[in-house]
Amino acid sequence: MIQPQTLEIRNGEKIPAIFSKEEMDNRFQAIRSLMEVQKLDGILFTSFHNINYFDHFLYTAFGRNYGLVVTRDRICSVTANIDGGQPWRRGVGENLIYTDWQRDNFFAAVQELLKGSQKVGVEYDHLSLQNLEKLKYVLPQTDFADISETVMQQRMIKSEEEIELIRNGAQVADIGGQACVEALAEGVPEYLIARHSTHTMVQEIAKRYPDSDLMDTW
């Protein structure tokens, strides 16, 4: 029996995004303008920051590859089966899961999404040389171009919604710092102080962003 290389798991419902649809549309409009200028048929993001920036899903690698494919008419994350349906629920776009049944199924999934592309943008500051060679193998007719610096410049210009998120993050950090001071006492172990501070911040994040995924709690 031949096991599948890719599959889809759409259990549950899409989770409300932290940023508005208008905010996300502006990001994709900017990235697709870049694609137009550089004559790219698609982009494969692989870094934590860009996948989170464009899809709202923050992955934990578990030794596996993750990606986000952006074309002129599609947004699709490529994730490991270990995450199940969470990337689809959290992400703003589609989701394609690769299985562990065969080696390098991640690249089979990328091939499925980008087959026929003449030019694809990738992140040279994150993509390993080994993985770049594997991409060239599954997409032999495709040229690859580095878009990491240009996309970084896009992320540096903060919107009002992003500034508001940064302010909230700073306020949460202040609350955590105050909790740390409150817990300080002679003979109290450092790990207890850190745990109290972290727990206080997690509670505050949950209050401010009730639909968020809290790291290390799922």
Task: Name these PLM-found stretches.
Residues 154-218:
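Internal metal/ion-chelating core segments
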Residues 1-176, 200:
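A composition/biophysics-driven feature that prefers long, compositionally simple stretches
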